[in-house]
């Protein structure tokens, strides 16, 4: 026993040192494992957060593009009403049917229920029904149009239908392409600003948390005490003076300072600028297209025969010549932008047409955000990449309408045996009368102006929406890359 005690006493220092070393090693390993796990956990959270942010940005981008399509569907009825003022094709068709009916009555050829099935031609008998209420022009315009068409001869009515149908579909092609481009730019600019603000706020919050974690418990406790003392009611400034009145400047700031409302009004004003294109901007190329259509089709008689390739070639020539006005003239840049956005001195006029008085008051007090958004849009519109996308949209529009017109012509090209006065198909293959092309073009415009927001069945808008170049441009704007 004494020997064991003496052995312990002799090696006491070794035992102490060994115990300390073992404890130190154990503590070091434990701390290392703890911090390693903590670091790995933070890295996992960081990667998960980054992946979540990327997915959120991607989802928001996809949703923004879908919103642009919804916006186009909502604006189609407006476009229908605007174009109906100068291109009311339905009234011309009704007048032609009236002429046909008068001719039948004068010959005494109508009997029984034949009235329902009468048509001016195989194309007219296969026409789509009259448009819905949303697509009709105002009653006063209808009355004027009917009075004008009723005094014209059958040949004049056919000539009007031919020129107006072709002019309308080309104007509609350019207007829809421009509107699709403008809507994509506007919504992606707004979406980018939104997610950048969110990212900045998130980064600032993380930076504050990081700085807070660097302090010791004592400093954190002292800062917490300081924060509590600063949040006491005495800190809140009383706008009242010593006599109980409220200072005028303070009252003005308190009543008008509403950043969220101001931001909302500015964004709505920015989106409402599309009114310019639908009501004023399109007039700049309307006269050009009308003149080109007259040059190509003025001398064509409704009974003249033309192949599908010949008709397509004439339409293509009009598109090419119009594109030169947009893209190859010295003043093309100014013309292009002036079609989409109003001049600065006309912005107030446009906003007065689209916003309510309360919103206008807010906008007059603070329109800085609107100016920034318009400036960004102008910068995007001046980019060569934007012009390339517009050319792609117009090119896709041309191919789409020609495919639709060809389908319409083929579906209406079966002649009726008793309809010798209105036979529109030539004996030679793939040759049709101009009258049939006019009817087919009119029906194509009705298809292009479909506004079924619930059914989303406008194939024309769907094709434009799916153009890859448009998605690439949207991605550049959304991600804040240079164009």
UniProtKB/Swiss-Prot annotation:
Just give the chief location class.
membrane
Give the membrane topology: Single-pass membrane protein
Spell out the protein name for this chain.
Peroxisomal biogenesis factor 3
Molecular function terms from GO: protein-macromolecule adaptor activity
Q: Where is this region: Disordered?
A: 119-149, 230-253
Supply the source organism for this entry.
Kluyveromyces lactis (strain ATCC 8585 / CBS 2359 / DSM 70799 / NBRC 1267 / NRRL Y-1140 / WM37)
Q: Quote the InterPro entries the UniProt record gives.
A: Peroxin-3
One Gene Ontology cellular component term attached to this UniProt record is:
peroxisomal membrane
Query: Residues on the Peroxisomal side?
Result: 1-14
